Amino acid sequence: MIACSGPRGMVKIEPNGNEAAPEDSLEYELIVMDPGFETWYMLQNTPARYRSQEYYEGWNQQYVSAWNYLATQPGRRSFFQTIMGYEPGEDYGFELNHKLFYYFQYVEQVLRIPILDHRPVGVVF
């Protein structure tokens, strides 16, 4: 499970509570506690903009690494309070990786809180 909290709310990645799922097919769910994100995400979430799961995983690894670094820096902790436990080798699936990637875009572009020095090229909002 990962959780990140800030003045706007909290983000969690946790196993989905589906008890009937076999152990080898664990599903995860991303929960964002910022109502502004959900509305924004619905407007941005169009299949014409989809990239591959590998694309989102690559960017998410960079964003999580930067997020975790910022969470350990004095003065930056007001927004980046919690370390994210996103594991590079774990298969979180397309939907979760897509939504997490868009959460990072929301933080940078809507909330105007920089995370990475460089951004994905060709991502238009």
Regions found by a protein language model. Name each.
Residues 67:
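Secreted/periplasmic serine-hydrolase-like ester/acetyl group-modifying domain
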Residues 40-53:
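Acidic/histidine-rich, surface-exposed loop or edge segments in extracytoplasmic proteins
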Residues 1-12:
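Bacterial Sec-dependent N-terminal signal peptides
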Residues 13-38:
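Post-signal peptide N-terminal segment of mature Sec-exported envelope proteins
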Residues 62, 70-125:
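Compact alpha-helical subdomains of small soluble proteins
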Residues 50-62, 114:
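Soluble non-cytosolic domains of exported or imported proteins
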